[in-house]
């Protein structure tokens, strides 16, 4: 059943709007909180977090968002891992790829200081949306936290793990993340 839910979400590219409606996100709650989840929380999910934190707002042209959310609140992203070693630093190649590709370090987006965090029930309680970086992460989340299935979704594209790869591998991964995050939150792969 869980695998079929994950497959359906990927095949039908379930809209963020539908997810928000299902979990009852209120237009009065600021900001929309999104948690990206990968395996170790040192490469893909912190890069997705940094990308969305740089975008950081719900634009008026967002095709995936309910009208009552448009330009009325920001988005704050965080990240976690399904098998994270608490406190491990972000991969230096992830930092280098983000910097090289114009993701700014700001007080609200201080990704070089990121340390790995193991996903917990409190994350699912406090975040509006939990986004698996791949179908396998989404399936693991739904298995571990079935009571929060309505908050859990997946990027439309599985993002390969660059762990241990070259800077070029991380840059290719970042490009896929930007594309997937842009499509999910802004209806535009070039957001």
Give each language-model segment a name.
Residues 2-191:
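Short polar/charged helix/loop
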């Amino acid at each position: 059943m869980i695998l079929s839910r994950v497959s359906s979400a990927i095949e039908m590219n379930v809209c963020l709007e539908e997810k928000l409606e299902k979990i009852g996100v209120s237009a009065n709650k600021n900001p929309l909180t999104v948690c990206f989840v990968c395996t170790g929380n040192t490469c893909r999910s912190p890069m997705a977090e940094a990308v969305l934190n740089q975008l950081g707002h719900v634009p008026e042209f967002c095709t995936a968002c309910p009208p009552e959310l448009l330009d009325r609140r920001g988005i704050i992203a965080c990240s976690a891992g399904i098998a994270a070693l608490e406190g491990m630093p972000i991969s230096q190649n992830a930092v280098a790829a983000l910097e090289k590709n114009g993701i700014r370090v700001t007080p609200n987006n201080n990704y070089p200081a990121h340390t790995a965090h193991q996903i917990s029930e409190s994350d699912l309680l406090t975040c509006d949306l939990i986004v698996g970086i791949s179908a396998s992460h989404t399936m693991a989340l739904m298995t571990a936290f079935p009571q929060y299935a309505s908050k859990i979704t997946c990027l439309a594209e599985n993002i390969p793990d660059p762990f241990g790869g070259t800077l070029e591998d991380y840059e290719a991964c970042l490009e896929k993340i930007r594309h997937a995050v842009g499509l999910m939150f802004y209806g535009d792969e070039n957001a």
